[in-house]
């Protein structure tokens, strides 16, 4: 059952099923030429909000070995895709001017897209010098994302595109992540099944 926090901004209701801490296991499965990497990992994901028009996201993953060897970390922000207006904060630390937009369920309905769901923007930063901007859609308990841009530092490994799929199935968060990296075209990379921990 999905519980919507009473202090949740109306604009975040389409993403509300993500809120909380999720933990579970997954499989890393990626091939580069004749080299094939297949490992099991543990993961902890958190989605939270601070009353603004976005969800804060964080993820840590570790190998399922005796040392729980750290595997990956990422953080970012998820929000409905729309043009920001005077009532929205930013850029930088500039406060919004005037009333906050999309404060009611009725006004949020105006953002519903022709596909029946809502378009979303997701920005994710990795500590290895890669930043991703995803565009996609949330339609009920399913989210489809594809990179619109990938930015890398000069020393980062080659990484050019990705897609991600998230879904709520039998009260578990399932996800799959395909990447184009290290000279390879877009292909299967990792997936996991997570249960709500908090």
Curated annotation (Swiss-Prot):
Function: Heme-binding protein able to scavenge peroxynitrite and to protect free L-tyrosine against peroxynitrite-mediated nitration, by acting as a peroxynitrite isomerase that converts peroxynitrite to nitrate. Therefore, this protein likely plays a role in peroxynitrite sensing and in the detoxification of reactive nitrogen and oxygen species (RNS and ROS, respectively). Is able to bind nitric oxide (NO) in vitro, but may act as a sensor of peroxynitrite levels in vivo.
Keywords: Heme, Iron, Isomerase, Metal-binding
Catalytic activities: peroxynitrite = nitrate
Residues the record lists as binding heme b: 189
Family of this protein: Belongs to the nitrobindin family.
Name of the protein this chain belongs to: Peroxynitrite isomerase
Annotated metabolic or biological route of this protein: Nitrogen metabolism
PANTHER family in UniProt: PEROXYNITRITE ISOMERASE THAP4, THAP4 PROTEIN
Motif GXWXGXG per record, residues: 20-26
InterPro entries named in the record: Calycin, Nb(III)_bact/plant, Nitrobindin, THAP4-like_heme-bd
